[in-house]
């Protein structure tokens, strides 16, 4: 009986652990993005903010996107969890990113990346790594095989290129 319960629990855990591609999240322009389109791709998921000391990383994220877009898909998630450093609306954030950094990688609507109202995607990332964002511009590298690696804010996106 214990073996059956363990096997059943493991089965449901494994089913839940693989649900990244079930997410549907709105982009900054309001269009829904189905994460199933990212199956088989290496992803770099980043929580962003417009008024942070790390905000210049947008330029490096864009550079990495331009150089490695055939190998790596960057997904940006604005969040106002740390110091109120992302106060803008989705429209204001989109304008800021385009005007100041020429961002062309996929940006999503503003979400919460930690706390009681943490978005399910970030709960999934936390469950996979045991790590959650400690500040803006934390990064998760998600490989096609399902492995996920966490990088702190101070790690420049260019430093992650060797991992892809």
Please provide the spans of the model-predicted regions.
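Sec-dependent N-terminal signal peptides
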Residues: 3-13
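Thiol-based oxidoreductase modules, predominantly thioredoxin-like and allied folds used
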Residues: 71-88, 104-115
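Thiol-/selenol-based redox modules, centered on thioredoxin-like
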Residues: 123, 127-164
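A short beta-strand-turn-helix
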Residues: 22-42, 63-68
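Conserved helix-turn-beta segment immediately C-terminal to the redox Cys motif
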Residues: 41-42, 51, 56-80, 97-101
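Amphipathic alpha-helical repeat scaffolds
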Residues: 27, 47-51
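Short, internal strand/loop/helix patches
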Residues: 22-24, 91-136
